Amino acid sequence: PRPDKVAPCVTDRQVDLVIRWGTEHDSLGTVEQFTMNTKGELFTYRGSIAERADGGYSLAVEQSKYCDLAKDVMSCFLKTQALNVRGTRARYIEYRNVRSDVYLRAVWNPDLETFQSRDMRELYDQLMKLIPRD
């Protein structure tokens, strides 16, 4: 069943928070994107970068797990501050809260393992564990 309430760790100012991550394939013009809202609902979109959307509902993450992940994402952004290293493929993590006008995005080349991208790569792997294998 889909959750009908936001996770208990979510404040009034965080209700609209969205966490996104995925891989953009610039040469193909495609993206594989995952979006998680404050209810812990996970949405998947695979397709054209130009037509990007939140995608279809995939699953609901346990709300305690959501709280841990949201905290980890914010901590990682506070630690990393800025990361924008693109290649023909680019991995990314976004933290977006429209209500408080916060938009954070880290982008890195998954074909390179740089010191600067280490924390984001680890966080990306942690987020990808939520995605069921096809």
Tell where the protein language model's regions lie, with residue ranges:
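Residues that act as N-cap/strand-start positions at coil-to-secondary-structure junctions
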Residues: L28-T30, A53, G87
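Short, well-ordered, aromatic-rich surface patches in folded extracellular/luminal domains
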Residues: P1-D26, C76-D134
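Short, solvent-exposed loop/hinge segments that bridge or flank secondary-structure elements
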Residues: H25-N37
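Well-ordered beta-strand positions in beta-sheet-rich domains
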Residues: V31-Q33, G56-S58, R105
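Structural signal for glycine-centered tight turns and loop->strand junctions in beta-sheet-rich domains
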Residues: T38-L42
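A short-motif feature that recognizes glycine-rich, charge-decorated loops
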Residues: F43-K79
